Amino acid sequence: MFDVFGSVKGLLKLDSVCIDNNLFRLHYKATVIILIAFSLLVTSRQYIGDPIDCIVDEIPLAVMDTYCWIYSTFTIPNRLNGKIGLEVAHPGVGAHVAGKDEVKYHKYYQWVCFVLFFQAILFYIPRYLWKTWEGGRIKMLVLDLNSPVVNEQSKADRKKLLVDYFATNLHTQNFYAYRFFICEALNFVNVVGQIYFMDLFLDGEFTTYGSDVVRFTEMEPEERSDPMSRVFPKVTKCTFHKYGPSGSVQTFDGLCVLPLNIVNEKIYVFLWFWFVILSVLTGIGLVYRLATAMGPQMRMYLLRARSRLAPQDQIETISNKCQIGDWFVLYQLGKNIDPLIYKELVADLAKKLEGKEIV
């Protein structure tokens, strides 16, 4: 089992230079790891174990298993609440009249592992776009200043290069910042879109699935209907047709056990809560980003928080002279440069922008 998750270890590696933020990393690191781990877990049980076992008289078990795996199994929604052993064999499994009773096919069953992996790819796309657009700019600008132990001459030279870079490229870096903001918006569109994608995949059951499970746990035992048994039944029906000795069509009703649904029901409960929380946090992050894009005062407060060692007047000078792109690059550098060196960089940059000589 540990080998199954071994391929996920590479995603846990931390980057030496930070080019985004914690919320962004929840999308392309935490969520991608979760989805790939779940996909591997389902795959290991699906293709190493036995994903379906069907029972029916007169039909070889291997044939029935293969047939029901390909053509999907079903339950009868109006048999979900019958008494097990008396009215129904299992929740949703009972006698039904073809054409009269509604049947619900569970076509998602064999596709769960592929869909989870596809979702992981979608969550990585905004990160891939930003990494491509960013082009290693922050890594190039850091120039080993993320270490507190730097030769004084090298430190002075690299600080001068940074100050000259900002002075030369002043007011030309807005597009760089806007591309990051676009990727943040894509994160939000992606997570909300995936909630509705999973709802479509599970035949309209996902958007209320988590809240239904919570409501189920709070209800009295005799009044409640298990939503997990409705969406992810462990026992289903499968109808097999074949020709009899006289050439007439014979119909056989079989019972199928779906062991993977024991895992699937837990996976999708977790994903419901994770996606809802992630979409709320990302929405709040977009409001925060809008505030920074529209409010110079907000940017000044954030820069002051990032460079607490720098005097107030230097922060105000930089905030007044810089546009959002310049502020964003400087703010990102603050995440990667040693605080003492960053304080000196802010001081030198403030002097440069004021037209003073840097000593």
Swiss-Prot record:
Keywords: Cell junction, Cell membrane, Gap junction, Ion channel, Ion transport, Membrane, Transmembrane, Transmembrane helix, Transport. Its main location: membrane. Pfam families: Innexin. The keyword Mitochondrion does not apply. Residues 44-109, 202-266 are extracellular. It is a multi-pass membrane protein. It is found in: Cell membrane; Cell junction, Gap junction. Belongs to the pannexin family. This is Innexin inx2. It comes from Schistocerca americana.
